[in-house]
Swiss-Prot record:
Intrachain S-S bonds: none
Residues where NAD(+) binds: 127, 190, 213
Active-site residues annotated for this sequence: 329-330
Binding residues for Zn(2+): 260, 263, 363, 422
HAMAP family (UniProt xref): HisD
A GO CC term assigned to this protein in UniProt: cytoplasm
Annotated Gene3D superfamilies: 1.20.5.1300, Nitrogenase molybdenum iron protein domain (3.40.50.1980)
Homology family: Belongs to the histidinol dehydrogenase family.
Gene Ontology terms: biological process: L-histidine biosynthetic process
Cofactor-binding details, from the entry: Binds 1 zinc ion per subunit.
Keyword Plastid: no
Protein name per the record: Histidinol dehydrogenase
Pathway: Amino-acid biosynthesis; L-histidine biosynthesis; L-histidine from 5-phospho-alpha-D-ribose 1-diphosphate: step 9/9
Length: 431
């Protein structure tokens, strides 16, 4: 990790420029895959599954059967099943408590009846990635809020695997616990194309959520740009930004940075502090842990070499300002008085308050969602939640008195915008 002590703005810009996910490089390949799936459906899915995943399936294998779920249960350790069930309970409880509960509200706007109604998105597709590792926790984090929101059908796509159930057994158990209606053994851009356009087997959905690699992200953006389906957010490499003072534990901080770095060679791990002593202690501890040997060491080393920074600034207020510019996926406040800093936090996917609140607790068990904006998108949105699975529909009702009051406004503005028939539609209703 690189240490910067009271850096100049040019050096801070280097910290802010973490790895970005450039979909333009893969977009031509994704477009070809997309068109092929739209044109040939299941046949294309089976070919891409064999080519990219090395798993040969028949059409009837695309959808996971009830027997497969039973076998998956037998393959997964009971302690893992119990952990998934306990995590699911907490995730569901959190999302039920954050569910917008208003079915319809009406109110008066200058004498006119207006209002809102909330409706669940009918069909949702959840992408649960494979690749470097299987992520059953992502199945919980995507399926549960959709189900809590009242979506009529919730389906899952996850990459196939070469085993007895031809998918991650842990993911299948998690999906069953979460309550999805169907699971398909298909991953990558082809999975997104199938969910967006539908095939003989895969149900076409109204929205796609869940993280994935650059091909998955490009496919989601392509599906959205073509008006086929809505999507949640682009997903880039994972990142953590830690703010610490001299009350922090250097060993804990070092392990927190390493934990984030193990996600991906392009992951980012940044520590900002007002204590040079803490900064040097954390850097030394990271090096000690790496020298002693850790699991996933190659990934961690690449990530910390590319996007690992320890920054010493003059005050914690400056650290918060830098964090707001960074807009991290995960923000940890490892300081003596975290509430004082929390009120100034503007941009973060999720905030972890206090020395005890390590990011992995939020990844798995506290309850809030771990599908979060990366790459600076926390400037504009926060975590996935039940609000992502409902539509807010405005309602308005005019009565005769409203027509006379509003018609002059509408007629004037419609004429100015060159839409005379808008004005005529209103004039026809005047007494």
């Amino acid at each position: 990790m690189r240490l910067l002590v009271r850096p100049e703005e040019e050096e801070l810009e280097r910290v802010l420029r973490r790895s970005e996910m450039d979909v333009t490089e893969v977009l031509p390949d994704v477009e070809r895959i997309f068109e092929d799936v739209v044109e040939r459906g299941d046949e294309a899915l089976l070919e891409y599954t064999e080519r990219f995943d090395g798993v040969k399936l028949e059409a009837e294998d695309l959808r996971v059967s009830e027997d497969d779920f039973e076998v998956a249960r037998e393959l997964v350790d009971e302690r893992t099943v119990e952990a998934l069930e306990e995590a699911a309970h907490r995730i569901e409880e959190f999302h039920r408590k954050t569910l917008p509960r208003v079915d319809r509200i009406t109110f008066d706007v200058e004498g006119t009846e207006c209002g809102l109604t909330l409706r669940p998105i009918p069909r949702v597709g959840c992408y649960v990635p494979g690749g470097r590792a299987a992520y059953p926790s992502t199945a919980l984090m995507t399926v549960i809020p959709a189900r809590v929101a009242g979506c009529r059908e919730v389906v899952v796509c996850t990459p196939p695997a070469d085993n007895d159930v031809r998918a991650s057994p842990e993911v299948l158990v998690a999906v069953e616990i979460a309550g999805a209606d169907a699971v398909y053994r298909v991953g990558g851009a082809q999975a997104i194309a199938a969910l967006a356009a539908g095939t003989e087997t895969v149900l076409r959905v109204d929205k796609i959520v869940g993280p994935g690699n650059v091909y998955v992200t490009a496919a989601k953006l392509l599906a959205y740009s073509r008006g086929l389906t809505d999507v949640d957010m682009p997903a880039g490499p994972s990142e953590v930004f830690v703010i610490a003072d001299d009350s922090a534990n250097p060993d804990w901080l070092a392990r927190d940075l390493i934990a984030q770095a193990e996600h991906d060679p392009h992951a980012a791990a940044v520590l900002a502090t007002d204590s040079e002593e803490i900064a040097r202690a954390v850097k030394e501890r990271v090096e000690e842990l790496l020298d002693a040997g850790i699991e996933r060491e190659e990934i961690v080393l690449k990530a910390l070499d590319r996007n690992g920074w320890i920054v010493v600034l003059d005050s914690l207020e400056e650290c918060v300002r830098l964090a707001n510019r960074y807009a991290p996926e995960h923000l940890q406040l490892c300081v003596e008085n975290p509430e004082e800093l929390l009120q100034d936090v503007e941009n973060a996917g999720a905030v972890f308050v206090g020395h005890l609140t390590a990011v992995p607790f939020g990844d798995y068990a506290t309850g809030p969602n771990h599908v979060l904006p990366t790459g600076g998108f926390a400037r504009a949105r926060g975590a996935l939640g039940t609000w992502d699975f409902v539509k807010i529909i405005p309602i308005q009702r005019l009565r005769e008195g409203d027509v006379e009051r509003l018609a002059p406004i509408v007629e004037e503005l419609a004429e100015r915008e060159g839409l005379p028939n808008h004005a005529e539609a209103v004039r026809a209703r005047r007494s």
